Structures are given as C-alpha cells and as structure tokens.
Amino acid sequence: ADPFVEEDPTLQPVAGDYAIRVKLASRSNMEGIWVGFPDSGEYIDSNHPDELLLGLDSLQAESLSECIALEVDCCLPHLTGILDQYDSASELVRHAIDFGYVWAEQGQGAPHWLDKWQAVLELEDCHRLDLALDLAQNLQHYEFFPRGMDLAAYGRELAVRNGVIPPSRLITYAFDGAAYAEANMGQYGLSTTDHGYVAWNGGERRYEYSQPEHHSPALSI
C-alpha cells in the first residue's frame, strides 16, 4: 500500500539522531509515535522510508491520511512553528522526508554548505520548512564567506572554484587570495549573519516547495 495515497517496534529516537522528527497519531494510537528523517535503515526509498512504514505499522494506519501530526522537532533552530505551516500530516511528512535527504547530502560535500544554508535562511528571514527546502536548492545564487575564515586561503579556494586560477599548488599559493576575497565581498555587499557573510548574487531562484504568499517580504530582490 502507498501510505501517501491511502499501511511492532515503536521507535523513539533520541534528539539529535535525526535532522527532523514528526510525532504522528492515529485513532488506534492517540499518544502518538515519533518518525525521524533521514532514514538510517538499509532499505532506502525516498517515498516510503523504513522509518515511515514502521511508524504507520505502529499506528495501525494504512496511510498518512489516517494520521494527524502532533509535534515537530527540527535540528535548525531558525525554522519555527512548523506544525502550523501544514494542513495535513501527508504534506508535512513529504517535506520532512525531503528535508532529511537534503540534510544527509550536505550539498554533496560542498565546502561550508551547512553554514551557507543557515546564513541564507537568516538573510531571507526564513522560518518555514517549505521555503528552507527551496533555498537549499538555490544556494548557488548566493555569495557566501564563512565566519572566522582565513581570508587568503578562502580567496584562493574561491578563485579555483570560479575558474579564475587552475588548481595548481604553485599557482594557488602565489595568488593573492586575500585581495580576491575582499574584492568579492565588496562587490556583493554581503550581510552579516551568525554563520557568515552572505548576499544574493542576482541569479534566478526556482521554487518547488513554497508558495509566493509564504515568502518573506524581506526576501532579497
């Protein structure tokens, strides 16, 4: 059965084991059980993770349409009031699953990815889960400099990434990374956040999860 369309261990994960947890309840289990993402099981299915199937089994529910969400616990403190942002447990869990995958991938190893994501969330005054998912897919449209960075080292790293210099150790160390980093910071007029310095670079952002009426008036334009 497809739990999104219309199915005995009760997992109670310790806080911190998951990027996001949703407490679901059903007529058969009004106290509810926690389901967490990303799924850590051996069987990986983006639509029906083990964690969700085990949760539905514990709730004696065939689908999420038979469930209600009671609580949400998210690892990013900037995202608040998530439970009130959704009309159905099904949509909430869909987005929680995707959030778990975004968290697990961490930008496929891109440097400073998590700090950049959190800096963008702060810049855009984002408190919604759906908008956070969209911003995670639009990070290439933001310039970012981490806090506490070695300006010269980061400037060299940025120059290689931007194709300004080849990834040659000899050329890289001879390059004035500090001047390049400072020039980029000045060009974009970066804002200061708790996780670094960030600004929208003017690229066209695409939105898959969030609706325009839920975008903050502060969204950079």
Please identify what each model-predicted range represents.
Residues A1-L11, G41, D45-R169, Y173, ...:
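Mixed-charge (acidic/basic) macromolecular-recognition segments
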Residues A25-N29, L151-R156, V160, R169-L170, ...:
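Residue-level signal for functionally critical sites in structured catalytic/ligand-binding pockets
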Residues A178, E182-S216:
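Long, highly charged low-complexity segments enriched in Glu/Asp and Lys/Arg with interspersed Ser/Thr
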Residues K23-M30, D57-L59, T193, N201-G202:
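Short, flexible beta-strand-to-coil junctions
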Residues V22-L24, V35, L53-L54, A132-L135, ...:
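Generic structural hydrophobic/aromatic packing signal, biased to beta-strands
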Residues W34-G36, N47, L170, Q187, ...:
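Generic alpha-helix signal with a bias toward terminal, lower-confidence helices
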